[in-house]
């Protein structure tokens, strides 16, 4: 088995190189670099503020804001990476669920705005209280997406039926034109 060395600040981690290594890399890099760097920089900034080094406090507080913005950029970059993996490579359903579950859950409602309406309608139809917490699961939505296949088949069958009917219409129309022309030719003789 191949091993992939990943060096962190504290320890040396060995990771087996197989299909989940990009997921592991995405989750650990995102958690380690952005969040821990911004929290460490903000701790240093509060240390400088408590010791009255206000210039360094301002510099490090602005650096912590930069790392928070960088975290948002990095998470969007990783989500685009996962989207490209899902689009360019064909996966079976459990692997696809695993990749989608590692995406940023706040972006799921942006990609699928109907999920918010489904959630609101379920809350109103079940007469749940104001404090009830109801979240949609991505895996459930993926299972329910199998209902889209008959709609696709129905669309394909309707196009096929349209082409068959149009072909028959134009075929008989051309046949009628040729019989009229032959009748007119026979009448002139």
Swiss-Prot record:
Keywords: Mitochondrion. It is found in: Mitochondrion. GO terms for cellular component: mitochondrion. This is Uncharacterized mitochondrial protein ORF16. It comes from Paramecium tetraurelia. The lineage of its organism: Eukaryota, Sar, Alveolata, Ciliophora, Intramacronucleata.
